[in-house]
Amino acid sequence: RPSMTASERPIQIIPSVLPADWAAMGQCVKDLEAAGVDRIQFDVMDGNFVPNLTFGPELIKACRRHCNVMFETQLMVSQYNCETMLEQYVEASKGPNGEPGVVIAHVEANTHLHRVLGRIRQLGGSPSVAMNPHTPMDMVKNVLDMVDHVLVMTVNPGFGGQAYIPTMLDKISQLRQTIIERDLTVDIEVDGGIKANWTISQCCAAGANCFIAGSGMFAYPTLKEGCDDLRRVAEDARAGNVLPTPA
């Protein structure tokens, strides 16, 4: 029987700061911490791998002074950017006492994925890998033993507020099955159109345990309500109460 670690990974609610007021990012991370989130995700986009430009390591580093919650950085950047700036991203993502922050490299952007993931670990980060909706699960099979998290994109990255792609559930369950078979302690994250409804519910039932929400959390009157609602629906799904796809 597989260890509990492989099958019942803790549920984590992780806001993406894309919909935040970027001119008040320090206050935003402080508010998110008070809302009870598990981590905060920074979507790094270089205008090359995706058609948008967002945050560099300096902004992430500046936010560290305003809260103690752990960070994760998703590198939606070209291979050149990933390789030349990796050390800065890993440093900026570290916790308040230098704990390893989650640094997510995209499988599609990196020809030498093992090298990148190994280097993240070596630099004191928590190596993780992301894949776009069209990318098959097989693309990450050979790096599962090197990573702490696998991020399954449920939209094509580049912009916030896009509609969730429901056909990723098979990929999530195949991934969880493989992780259990190999008895690995790997978290599955989902990102894109995740809300406190059937989307988070079905992803959780399929085997995901980390849920990234941007507009799905910031749409609430308070961030705490958003965080609590997302967590409740995920925990309900884990207890067997899975919400159906709307007709």
Where are these regions (language model features)?
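Hydrophobic faces of well-ordered beta-strands that scaffold small-molecule active sites
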Residues: 11-17, 40-42, 63, 71-75, ...
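Conserved, mostly hydrophobic/aromatic
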Residues: 25, 32, 43, 89, ...
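Catalytic cores of alpha/beta
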Residues: 29, 81-92, 135-146, 193-211
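Glycine-rich, proline-tolerant flexible connector loops at the mouths of alpha/beta enzymes
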Residues: 39-57, 155-163
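Glycine/small-residue-rich loop that forms an oxyanion/phosphate-binding "nest" at active or ligand-binding sites
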Residues: 52-120, 129
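Glycine-rich phosphate-binding active-site loops on the catalytic face of alpha/beta enzymes
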Residues: 98-109, 151-162, 206-226
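Histidine/lysine/aspartate-rich catalytic loop segments that bind and position anionic ligands
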Residues: 130-170, 174
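C-terminal helical cap(s) of enzyme catalytic domains, especially alpha/beta-barrels
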Residues: 219-247
